[in-house]
Amino acid sequence: MSETTTKTKEVSLDELWESAPISTHIFNPASLTHLPNAARLYLEHAIAPGAKLASAVRLWMHGEIKLGKKWHHFKGEEVICWNRGMIWRATTWMQGLPIWGADSVIDGASAVEWKILGLFPVMQAAGVDVTRSGAGRMQGESVW
């Protein structure tokens, strides 16, 4: 993801998940020596030596998201594929209508969109700043 572009590619959660290569990387605690002590200790206890390291992760979540001035319950799903990017999709309800949202960073391009009924755009963003933000989000969420 070193090259930053602004044209997003239409990729589904399933397509991104299926595109993840089978990992051949094995966890070696010696690779953690450069990390701060707290991070190193956490990872040494969380991952068994010799364990295969994942090339992707798929998460399901629920919580609250602030849209406008109010908090709304949401359910979401996210796929992070280390060599391609991430997609996060969520659904919430406002005034009885489903609102569908998504953030994505795929192959160096990013987009954010929210749609009423999954059809009518209420917010869309793309471009270099959105891509930079999305790449930062992916890095932050890569701890999962």
What are these regions (language model features)?
Residues S2-V57:
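N-terminal leader/targeting segments and the immediate start of mature chains
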Residues R40-G118:
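N-terminal mature ectodomain segment of secretory-pathway/periplasmic proteins
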